[in-house]
C-alpha cells in the first residue's frame, strides 16, 4: 500500500486537492484541517478522551485494548461502511490521522481486510500542517502588489480577476469590515492558514508567477489573522489605489450588501426568517462601530436604517439605505481609509479608476 511522506508529496496532495479521509476525532478536525479533508473519525470525542485517559494511567497496551473495545460491533461496522463509501467515491484519496500513527494504520488495515487498499499520509496532519506553514513562508517571499482603495471600489473583484491574485477575504469568508460577515462561518485559524497555503501553492503551480496580487488588508479579517510572514511582506509592498467615482461605489455596495445579502439570507432561511437575519446582520454591523460613531450619530443612522428596511420590505427598493450609507462612508469609512493610506503614502505607485488599475496590474 502506498504512503506519502516527502515534502513534495505533501505539496502535490494540496495542489491536486487530493481528497483526504481524516480519521481524527471531530474536536481535532475543528481545530485545524486540510482544505480537501472530510472527517470520518475512528473515535468520537468521548471515545478519544477515554482512550487518552487510559493511556496516561495504564499505558499504551491498555489504551489500545480500550480503543478496540469501544470501536467494535455495530459501531465499527457503521464506521467501516462510511470509510468504504468514501474510498469508493474518492479512489484517488488518502487516509490521514494526527501523526500517521495507529489510527490511520488501523483504519488502513481494516480496509485492506475488506478488500480495499488505500494509501495514508505518513506523518499525518502534523506533517501536512508543517508543509503549509513552510509553503506560506517560502511563497510570501515573492514580490507583492496590493490593491487599495476606499470601500466599494471593487478591490476584491479586481484581485479575483488576476491570474496571480489570491482573494484573502474569500478564503477568510469575511469581507474585512463591520459588515463583512458572510453566511459561511469562518474557519479555525489553522484551517484558514492551510487553505491560504493550498491556494498559493495552486496559483504558483499554474502560473509560475513572478508576483502576487492581494487586497490591501489589515492584519485581521474577521476572526482570522494573516500569517505573520505574509503580513510582514505586505507592509513592504507597493500599492495600486482604485479611485472610482462615489456613485459607482454606491452601486457596488448596494449590490453587495443589500441586494445580494438579502437574497442569500432568504435563500438560506426562507422569506420570513431570512428577512429577520438580514435585518439583524445590518444592525449588527452598524452596532459594531457605535463607539467610533458616537452615540448620537449612531442613533440617527440606526433610525435611518430602520426606515430603509421598512421601505425595502414594503416596496423591494433598497434606495432608502443611501440615507445612512452615504454619511457612513463620508464621515467614517472614507476618512479612516485615507488616514491609513497617508501613513503608507510612499508605497503608493499607481492611482486610477478600476479599469485603469486592472490594466496597470496586468502589465506587471
From Swiss-Prot:
Cystine residue pairs: none
Source organism, top-level taxon = Bacteria
Q: What is the active site of this protein?
A: 97 (s-selanylcysteine intermediate)
Catalytic activity annotation: 5-methylaminomethyl-2-thiouridine(34) in tRNA + selenophosphate + (2E)-geranyl diphosphate + H2O + H(+) = 5-methylaminomethyl-2-selenouridine(34) in tRNA + (2E)-thiogeraniol + phosphate + diphosphate; 5-methylaminomethyl-2-thiouridine(34) in tRNA + (2E)-geranyl diphosphate = 5-methylaminomethyl-S-(2E)-geranyl-thiouridine(34) in tRNA + diphosphate; 5-methylaminomethyl-S-(2E)-geranyl-thiouridine(34) in tRNA + selenophosphate + H(+) = 5-methylaminomethyl-2-(Se-phospho)selenouridine(34) in tRNA + (2E)-thiogeraniol; 5-methylaminomethyl-2-(Se-phospho)selenouridine(34) in tRNA + H2O = 5-methylaminomethyl-2-selenouridine(34) in tRNA + phosphate
By its UniProt entry, which Gene3D superfamilies does this protein fall under?
Rhodanese-like domain
Q: Which keywords does the record carry?
A: Selenium, Transferase
Q: What is its EC number?
A: 2.9.1.3
Molecular functions (GO terms): transferase activity, transferring alkyl or aryl (other than methyl) groups; tRNA 2-selenouridine synthase activity
* Domain named Rhodanese: residues: 14-137
Q: Which InterPro entries match?
A: Rhodanese-like_dom (IPR001763), Rhodanese-like_dom_sf (IPR036873), SelU (IPR017582)
Top EC class of this enzyme:
transferase
Q: Which Pfam families does the UniProt entry name for this protein? A: Rhodanese
**Function statement:** Involved in the post-transcriptional modification of the uridine at the wobble position (U34) of tRNA(Lys), tRNA(Glu) and tRNA(Gln). Catalyzes the conversion of 2-thiouridine (S2U-RNA) to 2-selenouridine (Se2U-RNA). Acts in a two-step process involving geranylation of 2-thiouridine (S2U) to S-geranyl-2-thiouridine (geS2U) and subsequent selenation of the latter derivative to 2-selenouridine (Se2U) in the tRNA chain.
Which family does the UniProt entry place this protein in? Belongs to the SelU family.
**Subunit:** Monomer.
Q: What is this protein called?
A: tRNA 2-selenouridine synthase
- Organism source for this protein? Escherichia coli O8 (strain IAI1)
Q: What's the encoding gene here? A: selU
Amino acid at each position: 500500500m502506498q504512503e506519502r511522506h516527502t515534502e513534495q508529496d505533501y505539496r502535490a496532495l494540496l495542489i491536486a486537492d487530493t481528497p483526504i479521509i481524516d480519521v481524527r476525532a471531530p474536536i481535532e478536525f475543528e481545530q485545524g484541517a486540510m482544505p480537501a479533508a472530510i472527517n470520518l473519525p475512528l473515535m468520537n470525542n468521548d471515545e478519544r478522551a477515554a482512550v487518552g485517559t487510559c493511556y496516561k494511567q495504564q499505558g499504551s497496551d491498555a489504551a489500545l485494548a480500550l480503543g478496540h473495545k469501544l470501536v467494535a460491533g455495530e459501531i465499527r461496522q457503521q464506521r467501516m461502511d462510511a470509510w468504504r463509501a468514501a474510498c469508493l467515491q474518492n479512489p484517488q484519496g488518502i487516509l490521514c490521522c494526527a501523526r500517521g500513527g495507529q489510527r490511520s494504520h488501523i483504519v488502513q488495515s481494516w480496509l485492506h481486510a475488506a478488500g480495499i487498499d488505500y494509501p495514508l499520509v505518513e506523518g499525518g496532519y502534523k506533517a501536512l500542517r508543517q508543509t503549509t506553514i513552510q509553503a506560506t513562508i517560502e511563497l510570501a517571499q515573492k514580490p507583492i502588489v496590493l490593491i487599495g482603495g476606499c470601500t466599494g471600489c471593487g478591490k476584491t473583484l479586481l484581485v479575483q480577476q488576476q491570474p496571480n491574485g489570491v482573494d484573502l477575504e474569500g478564503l477568510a469568508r469575511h469581507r474585512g469590515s463591520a459588515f463583512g460577515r458572510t453566511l459561511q462561518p469562518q474557519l479555525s485559524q489553522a484551517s484558514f492558514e492551510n487553505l491560504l497555503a493550498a491556494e498559493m501553492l495552486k496559483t504558483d503551480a499554474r502560473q509560475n508567477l513572478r508576483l502576487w496580487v492581494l487586497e490591501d488588508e489589515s492584519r485581521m479579517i474577521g476572526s482570522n489573522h494573516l500569517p505573520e510572514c505574509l503580513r510582514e511582506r505586505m507592509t513592504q509592498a507597493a500599492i495600486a489605489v482604485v479611485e472610482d467615482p462615489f456613485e459607482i461605489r454606491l452601486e457596488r455596495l448596494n449590490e453587495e450588501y443589500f441586494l445580494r445579502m438579502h437574497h442569500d439570507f432568504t435563500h438560506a432561511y426562507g422569506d420570513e426568517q431570512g428577512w429577520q437575519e438580514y435585518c439583524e446582520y445590518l444592525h449588527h454591523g452598524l452596532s459594531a462601530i457605535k463607539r467610533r460613531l458616537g452615540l448620537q450619530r449612531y442613533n440617527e443612522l440606526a433610525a435611518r436604517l430602520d426606515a430603509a428596511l421598512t421601505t425595502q420590505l414594503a416596496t423591494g427598493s433598497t434606495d432608502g439605505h443611501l440615507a445612512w450609507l452615504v454619511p457612513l462612508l463620508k464621515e467614517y469609512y472614507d476618512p479612516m481609509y485615507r488616514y491609513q493610506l497617508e501613513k503608507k503614502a510612499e508605497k503608493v505607485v499607481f492611482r486610477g479608476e478600476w479599469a485603469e488599475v486592472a490594466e496597470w496590474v496586468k502589465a506587471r
